[in-house]
Each structure stands twice: as structure tokens, then as C-alpha cells.
């Protein structure tokens, strides 16, 4: 449903959802309307998952405090400095921008190094950082290929992958 914070909009005959975040928002613990989540259960376990959406940052947007965008998650959907347990009961892969507007992927998973997930810059083949251009529509796509688990254990087989595209161009490929 529509609220003052969210509206269904039409742009070039395409419908979308416009979200406006209150000043000072950095996540759900900062108050009403400070996060967007779409939750659902898959009808069956999945080996590969995709998410793709279009985003337009308004002109004059101030990137200086950084920010986060939706991604994919499974199981306990770890985040917020909660490092996943070694039993492989959850993960999350989301997108963020830094103070300079550069785009990064961050992921919570069993083998992450720090408490706040591992981070990888989105960049082209020349290592030029990817950035959202205010006033322009961008298409963000993420693909997750999950590791399979060895029977009778919680150990992954390390054949998973995290891939990302910006406007149809691959800008991140991580495998394990």
C-alpha cells in the first residue's frame, strides 16, 4: 500500500515503487521507514538465486554517509555484525555505497573474516569503481550460486559464486 514514504510511480510507461527515507535513517533500528525488506519462502530449496531491480538516485543526492540496498539472503539472514555460526545456518549478500558513491557488495557467510561481512568493490575490467549516477536509472542484478553441502556434514564444497552486474555489465565475480 502507498504511504507518504512509498508511492507507486510511473516513468516511461513502467511502474515502480518510489521510496523516500527519512533524514538520519541507517537501518530498521533507527525508526519507522528506515528499511525495506521483501520476505518470502521459496517453494523448494534453490541452488541458484537472482535478484534484479532498477534504481534511480535523485539528482543532488548526498552519498557522504553511505547507504545500503536490497540483496539476497537465506536461513538466518545474518547481518548487523552477527557473524554466521560455523554450522552454515544462514547468509546474506547485499549492496551498499560508500561516502564517495562507489558501489560495493557485502556478504555475511560462514568463512567471512570480520564480524561485519566481507566487502568487494564493484569495478570494471580496468578497476574503475562503479558508481550510481544521480538522475539516471540503473539496473542492479545479483546472482548467488550456493555451495552444496557434503552429506552428513555442514561443510560446503566451495563451488559457489557471487556475481553482480550494473546496467547489464558484469562488475563482480567471486568464487569459492
Residue ranges and their predicted role:
Residues 1-176:
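Low-complexity, Ser/Thr/Pro/Gly-rich disordered linker/stalk regions
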